[in-house]
Amino acid sequence: MAGHSQFKNIMHRKGRVDAVRSKVFSKLAREITVAAKLGTPDPSMNPRLRAAILAARAENMPKDNIERAIKKAVGNDGENYEEIRYEGYGPGGAALIVEAQTDNRNRTASDVRSAFTKSGGSLAETGAVAFMFDRVGVIAFAADVADADTMLEAAIEAGADDVRSDADGHEITCAQDAYGEVSKALEARFGEPRRTGLIWKAQNTIDVDDETGEKLIRLVEVIEDQDDVQNVYVNFALSDALVEKMGA
């Protein structure tokens, strides 16, 4: 689930990977095609396409699949997908933003609404929770590309707003309008990032108890299982004990 590092282990736990693997490549391919259609098929000139290709590589998507997805956009032989944002609430009053790409708005709306309802959540009007999030750019590098001080200095010089460095790597956050320049400057200095793109970042997170946390995890999984859903962003935090338990 994009935008929430706590879920890295949970969403990749044993069994979960096999359950979603068949859908991962199709979703990645769809994003590549959409990005190439909206911009240029040259990733060096299209930040969104570059981000989509990096995400595909991170999931070990074959090069042929990536090239095929780009050609679908160039050849104009693919479906025309509409990008839609849904907003809603989960157990405990948690807020969620869902990004989808669809060729059938009515079908997707019905599927997303059903996913919320069956898991104890509720779909809300557009704008109901978006004000709790900021649209920001994120660029992430491996820990060994630089030490924390060097990365911080470079990121600030490039115009970034925040840098978090730990054993897992460096995550740089910047304003949406500055994303292109910041990512370009950092890539020129440190090379290709592990991931990059625009996300919805919660302004504040709410703590939930473990029982509510498990319900929210199930809600997110059900929503992400929808074929048209690309990303889910949340504003809740889980206890370390629950993260360890659910990631087992």
Curated annotation (Swiss-Prot):
GO molecular function, one term: DNA binding
Coiled-coil zones: none
Compartments (UniProt record): Cytoplasm
Pfam families found in the cross-reference section: TACO1_YebC_N, Transcrip_reg
An annotated GO BP: regulation of DNA-templated transcription
UniProt entry keywords in alphabetical sequence: Cytoplasm, DNA-binding, Transcription, Transcription regulation
GO CC terms, sorted: cytosol
Main location: cytoplasm
Matching InterPro entries: Integrase-like_N (IPR017856), TACO1_YebC-like_2nd/3rd_dom (IPR048300), TACO1_YebC_N (IPR049083), Transcrip_reg_TACO1-like (IPR002876), Transcrip_reg_TACO1-like_dom3 (IPR026564), YebC-like (IPR029072)
Family from the record: Belongs to the TACO1 family.
Database matches in HAMAP family: Transcrip_reg_TACO1
Name of the protein this chain belongs to: Probable transcriptional regulatory protein Mpop_0922
Organism, as annotated: Methylorubrum populi (strain ATCC BAA-705 / NCIMB 13946 / BJ001) (Methylobacterium populi)
